Swiss-Prot record:
Cell compartments where the protein resides: Cytoplasm
Source taxonomy: Bacteria, Bacillati, Bacillota, Bacilli, Bacillales
Pfam families on file: F420_oxidored, P5CR_dimer
Molecular function via GO: pyrroline-5-carboxylate reductase activity
Name of the protein described by the UniProt record: Pyrroline-5-carboxylate reductase
Reaction(s) catalysed (UniProt annotation): L-proline + NADP(+) = (S)-1-pyrroline-5-carboxylate + NADPH + 2 H(+); L-proline + NAD(+) = (S)-1-pyrroline-5-carboxylate + NADH + 2 H(+)
């Protein structure tokens, strides 16, 4: 199985680094290419022990899976460049936000299998939750291979393409939403009189420890919360204060706004 990455930006870098580190395939079977920054490309390739090239014909002749990791606005020119060299064995995996499978197929002028994936920045530490949708001609064995690749940098959740908007909101943008919540926690903690550095370090460790509790426990998050909430205690007092601000509606509004924007961006790209 040979992989070609078009684009070596932040997310593509996290993905191919995760795949290399997992050893799910030999690093010599991975090829990188980008639009113009050969210095950065060569540095990535040498550091990871993978190949790099600007020969589109040779790349597509070799590739089983072609990762499309360019900026969405650069894709049309990329498609124009590579479509003469597409072979029957090429299967495409898009990490470009907002571009539907139908649009990608139209620009490539090819009936090859196409998957869209929506990872998040936790791919950098091997813990992305990645939404994935497949075109109807993606075979079961190929799907298994793609799942194996995605598991190299996290976990996969397969959904119909229309539901990628929801996945984008919940898990794609999710790290930023949680970071914002943690920021507010730090700010509130400093207002209680502690040094900011103390609060930041405490909350960082609190987040890590709580994540491990969720990971290692078979209990629901609701039950984990109940287990540490004593009637009439300090935790109950704080939760009572939180409940007065209708957090459920706050988070629902947050996610709906992200979904709506994802739909809007997708519609713009199709025009």
């Amino acid at each position: 199985m040979k992989l070609v990455f078009y684009g070596a930006g932040n997310m593509a870098h996290a993905i191919f680094t995760g795949i290399v580190n997992s050893k799910v395939i030999d690093s010599n079977d991975i090829y990188l290419t980008n639009r113009s920054n050969e210095v950065a490309l060569k540095e990535y390739a040498e550091k990871l022990g993978v190949n790099y090239s600007y020969d589109d014909e040779a790349l597509l002749k070799a590739a089983d899976y072609v990762f499309l990791g360019t900026k969405p606005y650069d894709f049309e020119s990329l498609a124009e460049r590579i479509k003469p060299f597409i072979t029957d064995k090429n299967k495409f995996i898009s990490i470009m936000a907002g571009l539907p499978i139908s649009y990608i197929r139209e620009k490539l002028e090819a009936d090859n299998p196409i998957a869209r994936i929506m990872p998040n920045t936790n791919a950098h530490v091997g813990h992305s939750v990645t939404g994935i949708s497949f075109s109807s001609n993606f075979g079961p064995n190929s799907k298994d291979e793609v799942d194996e690749l995605i598991n190299a940098f996290g976990s996969a959740i397969e959904v119909p393409e229309d539901n990628l908007h929801q996945v984008t909101a919940i898990t794609g943008s999710g790290p930023a939403f949680l970071y914002h919540v943690f920021e507010q926690y730090v700010t509130a903690g400093t207002r209680l009189g502690l040094e900011k550095a103390q609060v930041e370090e405490s909350i960082r460790n609190l987040i890590i420890g709580t994540s491990k509790m969720i990971e290692r426990s078979e209990l629901s998050m609701e039950q984990l919360r109940k287990n540490i909430t004593s009637k009439g205690g300090t935790t109950q007092a704080g939760l009572n204060a939180l409940s007065q601000h209708d957090l459920e509606s706050v988070f629902e509004d947050c996610l709906r706004a992200a979904v709506d924007r994802s739909v809007e961006l997708s519609s713009q790209d199709e025009d």
